[in-house]
Amino acid sequence: MKRNNKNLSFILDVDGVLTNGQFIYSERGKVQKIFGAHDSDGLDLIKNHLKILFISSDKRGFKISSKRVKDMGFKLYYVTNQQRFKFVEKYNFQNVIFMGDGVYDVEIIKNSKYGITPR
């Protein structure tokens, strides 16, 4: 990527995008999520060219996700599924690349400049 386009925002959902979508539970509840070892490799290549941020609606697993995202050098926002569309809209859909995997992401993907879903 040659040019710097800081008005462009790359917004990623955490669960199902950075994770495999599975949670590990104990008798105390959610204790672990599984992340890919190389999640930040591609993001490191583009982070100086656009704004990158992460969202999650997982209240119980937020600390786990927040730690992983912070370790990668980014910020995680807690955004409920009902608030998700409005949150992304603040960044102007024509300036948003969005990556999500859930039913609450469909309208955001349709309205964003580029919408991406994991395989």
Which residues are covered by each model-predicted region?
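Generic hydrophobic secondary-structure packing signal
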Residues: 61, 84, 108-111
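Short phosphate-binding loop-to-helix
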Residues: 81-92, 105
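Short beta-strand/loop segments at the ligand-binding rim of alpha/beta enzyme cores
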Residues: 49-53, 91-98, 113-114
